[in-house]
Amino acid sequence: MAVKIKLKRLGKIRSPHYRIVVADSRTRRDGRAIEEIGLYHPVQNPSRMEVDAERVAYWLGVGAQPTEPVLAILKKTGDWQKFKGEPAPAPLLVAAPKATRPSFDALGGDDAGKGEAITQKKKAEKKDEAAAESSSSESTEA
């Protein structure tokens, strides 16, 4: 059985995501795969490439042939050079980590803002008004 390492397309129109899979060479592009060994997301900047190096080395060792796009990915990650015994390429560009927002606890959490309410509740206002009216009516009657 001829085995190929190829890309399986996922995602929406104009938003492709690929899985790097090992499949029989006669199966269709998005058909049944023997094993999934990586990811490739070309739309992200820089492109996201994750490859399970151990599984790639195994499949290349037993004779699986990578397609041209997969071969380019393997060369960028250095797995192809490792398999061939050549020097490794320059390291890949890694995305800068996003700035994290300060956590709720770091800003003081619930404890910082606790105190008495600035505005009074409506029920309390009505009770105060009713008490004031009843006391004023008692003082006028007496």
UniProtKB/Swiss-Prot annotation:
Presence of keyword Ribosomal protein: yes
GO MF, one example: structural constituent of ribosome
Protein family membership: Belongs to the bacterial ribosomal protein bS16 family.
Annotated protein name in UniProt: Small ribosomal subunit protein bS16
Top-rank taxon, per record: Bacteria
One of the record's GO cellular component terms: cytoplasm
GO biological process entries: translation
Keywords attached to this entry: Ribonucleoprotein, Ribosomal protein
A Pfam family of this chain: Ribosomal_S16
HAMAP family per record: Ribosomal_bS16 (MF_00385)
Organism name: Streptomyces avermitilis (strain ATCC 31267 / DSM 46492 / JCM 5070 / NBRC 14893 / NCIMB 12804 / NRRL 8165 / MA-4680)
SUPFAM superfamilies noted in UniProt: Ribosomal protein S16
Gene3D superfamilies cross-referenced by the UniProt entry: 3.30.1320.10
Stretch list, region Disordered: 101-142
